Amino acid sequence: MNTVFNGKDFANKYYLILKEFLKQHDLRDKIALKVVLANNEPASKLYVSIKNRVAKEIGLNVEVIKFSANSVQSDILEVIDRENKNLSTDGIIVQLPLLRHMDSNSILNSIVYSKDVDGLSFVNLGKMILGDKKGFIPCTALAVLKILLDEGIRTSGKTVVVVGRSPLVGKPISILLSSKPYDATVIVCHSKSIYLDVYLRQADIVISAVGKPKLIDKSMLCGEPYVIDIGISEIETDNGKILSGDTDFDNIKDCVKFITPVKGGIGPVTVLMLMFNTIKAHLINNNMFDILDRLEKLVEV
């Protein structure tokens, strides 16, 4: 029977585990996450509100720091510098995209790596490549690993086609899955790959994150692969705008073993991994490594 993944139920199960973990170790309301919001896009505001709600539900303190369209880059850098030095701040994230006149690399890399719980700084990306467990893996990549593990989808010796090469998603996933202990043979494709269908037909697992609606249909797949669809786009229909993934979901759902939908798929698990990383940051920065071991056993990745 083909499986359509339910990310909401998956994440809710672990939210209860994290909530109880914080209660048991007297950590409720003692871990602080700062969220920088510097754009006016409705989607970004929605994502921030979800992160804020979930964090508060499990027992984290959250502050959303908003910047107007008139803000300049130095305004954000000043706030990040302040929070880097603030001993009560455990994690700092910047909701992307930023305002057009701002350089995201400069801003992301201004966050001290020990508080970069989105795992997007050069330091944390380097730690990920080297397998340093004190670093932070980007949350979406971590969500993919968590889904594969919990759903019993073996990667060792399997062919994984990753469609997308962004530093936020595609590159981290391809690096991680080709490393120990995942040991997959990874083929990286992207929106300009000429023979995408040829590579996809070799795949045991397909992970797509390019943001091109309905790029992948059943004619491009072979042998009922597992599919994790991270891409999200808006498309026009006769009934107005709807969300679409990189896959033509209705077209392929019956010819794959497993698939994540656009709504309630990878998104809730990505938020879960942000909560995990934030708690991890607090434990590392306070030398609470015995408690960190317990956390990592509860939320195995």
UniProtKB/Swiss-Prot annotation:
Q: Which Pfam families match?
A: THF_DHG_CYH, THF_DHG_CYH_C
Top-rank taxon: Bacteria
Which Gene Ontology biological process is one annotated for this entry?
tetrahydrofolate interconversion
UniProt keyword terms in alphabetical order: Amino-acid biosynthesis, Histidine biosynthesis, Hydrolase, Methionine biosynthesis, Multifunctional enzyme, NADP, One-carbon metabolism, Oxidoreductase, Purine biosynthesis
Pathway field of the UniProt record reads: One-carbon metabolism; tetrahydrofolate interconversion
Q: Where does NADP(+) bind?
A: 164-166, 191, 232
GO terms for molecular function, please?
methenyltetrahydrofolate cyclohydrolase activity; methylenetetrahydrofolate dehydrogenase (NADP+) activity
List, alphabetically, the GO terms of the cellular component aspect.
Answer: cytosol
What's the catalysed reaction? (6R)-5,10-methylene-5,6,7,8-tetrahydrofolate + NADP(+) = (6R)-5,10-methenyltetrahydrofolate + NADPH; (6R)-5,10-methenyltetrahydrofolate + H2O = (6R)-10-formyltetrahydrofolate + H(+)
Supply the EC number(s): 1.5.1.5, 3.5.4.9
Database matches in HAMAP family: THF_DHG_CYH
Regarding protein family, the annotation reads:
Belongs to the tetrahydrofolate dehydrogenase/cyclohydrolase family.
Q: What interactions and quaternary structure are annotated? A: Homodimer.
Functional summary from the UniProt entry: Catalyzes the oxidation of 5,10-methylenetetrahydrofolate to 5,10-methenyltetrahydrofolate and then the hydrolysis of 5,10-methenyltetrahydrofolate to 10-formyltetrahydrofolate.
Protein's name in the database: Bifunctional protein FolD
| Organism, as annotated | Borrelia garinii subsp. bavariensis (strain ATCC BAA-2496 / DSM 23469 / PBi) (Borreliella bavariensis)
The organism's lineage?
Answer: Bacteria, Pseudomonadati, Spirochaetota, Spirochaetia, Spirochaetales
